[in-house]
């Protein structure tokens, strides 16, 4: 497990409405459109580097509280989004087996961004959005509970460089 993954799993999360952030940061963290698309507009080409993909059978308490009524196993996918070899985002996605039975293509994404698939789903709804700011690293992160039909997935994203927040969200 990477340090980034541990940081996301052990973070103190709060509802997005409870955090007072500068507009330059909140506009990225509260983005309701595709983060990948926004990164491409801000940085040009964005590449996905898959760090790990595997089944997990237990969630830590933090993820269990956020992820209602989801039984493991979950497909866990961890990636880094890069532009010009600069790491921009670490993402950890948890997809329950029940969602994969309907959308097995999620296990075949390879170096494609999840957002390319997710934002093509007409029945996609973001149920929850939580944010965190890690004082030790000064990194910001967000996690969302996304519904696809009657099923949920969790997407957590750690913003790896403050350079992101200097770019205007379009």
From Swiss-Prot:
Residues reported in the UniProt entry to bind substrate: 77, 114, 157
Keyword Methyltransferase: no
Highest taxon above the source species: Bacteria
Name of the featured protein: Probable chorismate pyruvate-lyase
PANTHER family the UniProt entry points to: CHORISMATE PYRUVATE-LYASE (PTHR38683:SF1)
HAMAP family: UbiC (MF_01632)
GO MF term (any one): chorismate lyase activity
UniProt entry keywords in alphabetical sequence: Cytoplasm, Lyase, Pyruvate, Ubiquinone biosynthesis
Protein family: Belongs to the UbiC family.
Gene Ontology CC terms, in alphabetical order: cytosol
Principal localisation: cytoplasm
UniProt pathway annotation: Cofactor biosynthesis; ubiquinone biosynthesis
Keyword Transmembrane tagged: no
Catalytic activity entry: chorismate = 4-hydroxybenzoate + pyruvate
Summary of the function given for this chain in its UniProt record: Removes the pyruvyl group from chorismate, with concomitant aromatization of the ring, to provide 4-hydroxybenzoate (4HB) for the ubiquinone pathway.
GO BP annotations, alphabetical order: pyruvate biosynthetic process; ubiquinone biosynthetic process
EC supergroup of this enzyme: lyase
Enzyme Commission number(s): 4.1.3.40
Cell location: Cytoplasm
């Amino acid at each position: 497990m990477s340090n980034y993954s541990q940081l996301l799993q052990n973070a103190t999360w709060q509802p997005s409405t409870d955090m007072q952030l500068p507009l330059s940061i909140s506009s990225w963290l509260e983005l309701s459109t595709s983060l990948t698309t926004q990164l491409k507009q801000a940085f040009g080409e964005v590449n996905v580097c898959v760090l790990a993909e595997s089944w997990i059978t237990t969630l830590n308490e933090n993820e269990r509280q956020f992820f209602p009524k989801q039984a493991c196993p979950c497909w866990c996918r961890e990636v880094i989004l890069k532009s010009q070899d600069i790491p921009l985002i670490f993402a950890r996605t948890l997809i329950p087996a029940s969602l994969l039975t309907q959308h097995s293509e999620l296990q075949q994404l390879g170096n494609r961004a999840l957002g390319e698939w997710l934002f093509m789903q007409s029945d996609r709804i973001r149920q929850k959005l939580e944010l965190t700011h890690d004082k030790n690293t000064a990194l910001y992160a967000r996690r969302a509970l996304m519904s696809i039909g009657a099923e949920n997935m969790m997407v957590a994203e750690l913003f790896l460089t403050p350079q992101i927040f200097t770019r205007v969200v379009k």
